[in-house]
Amino acid sequence: MFPENKMLLIAGPCVIEDNSVFETARRLKEIVAPYASSVHWIFKSSYDKANRSSVHNYRGPGLRLGLQTLAKIKEELDVEILTDVHSPDEAREAAKVCDIIQVPAFLCRQTDLLVTAGETQAIVNIKKGQFLSPWEMQGPIDKVLSTGNNKIILTERGCSFGYNNLVSDMRSIEVLRRFGFPVVFDGTHSVQLPGALHSQSGGQTEFIPVLTRSAIAAGVQGLFIETHPNPSSALSDAASMLSLKDLERLLPAWVQLFTYIQEMDAVSV
């Protein structure tokens, strides 16, 4: 699916807020451009955040307008697109535009959604639920494979640890790798504090650097990073998104470490 010698970077804003998403996508392309030989960038954003903490929180522009926006970004920037889906009907529509359709962590056991996602023959990114052990991902994988589609990505995004907290167990990455599919680490949702702000999730972005480096050292194929020009003003996941400025600052170290780990793995074979 992807060149193994390149680090996957699935990056973009949490949700499509307005036309500013185009400028964010352009800026991301500029940031990644110097690393074209080392990084495979995929743009991500959501047309609907269907599991917001409060009914009053912004969800997005909706399926029709959202997919139109993503299609324009795909055409203008010549970039692959990922978005998340929440029902079989959404999966069918999203696959007409997006190269990768994502099954959200909360929905990673929904059989009809996984099967329909597989039937589209798009690449399917399955995010491991916060409530699942890595071994239990065999079930979701088998549901997609049952359709004849073996284009699967597995994403680790932390596991629930008591109330309003997530932890990242790097052993999970090794377990997921053994399934034989590319493994990605979600460096921004992993620092969420779910429901900590009552009507929305909190976050500890100061831990993004150490967790992303740890995940790369553990052998992930890439990173999933939600990013925004000004996270504090974002309409969703404001407390856990990484600023574009910080992404640009961290990217060189990610690439350098990924390359080093690739070289070490080659020597140890």
Swiss-Prot record:
Its main location: cytoplasm. It comes from the Bacteria. It is found in: Cytoplasm. It catalyses: D-arabinose 5-phosphate + phosphoenolpyruvate + H2O = 3-deoxy-alpha-D-manno-2-octulosonate-8-phosphate + phosphate. One of its GO terms (molecular function) is 3-deoxy-8-phosphooctulonate synthase activity. The lineage of its organism: Bacteria, Pseudomonadati, Chlamydiota, Chlamydiia, Chlamydiales. GO terms for biological process: keto-3-deoxy-D-manno-octulosonic acid biosynthetic process. The keyword Transferase applies. Belongs to the KdsA family. GO terms for cellular component: cytoplasm. InterPro entries: Aldolase_TIM (IPR013785), DAHP1/KDSA (IPR006218), KDO8P_synthase (IPR006269). HAMAP family: KDO8P_synth. Its EC number is 2.5.1.55. Pfam families: DAHP_synth_1. Keywords: Cytoplasm, Lipopolysaccharide biosynthesis, Transferase. It is an enzyme of class 2 (transferase). Pathway: Carbohydrate biosynthesis; 3-deoxy-D-manno-octulosonate biosynthesis; 3-deoxy-D-manno-octulosonate from D-ribulose 5-phosphate: step 2/3; Bacterial outer membrane biogenesis; lipopolysaccharide biosynthesis. The gene is kdsA. This is 2-dehydro-3-deoxyphosphooctonate aldolase.
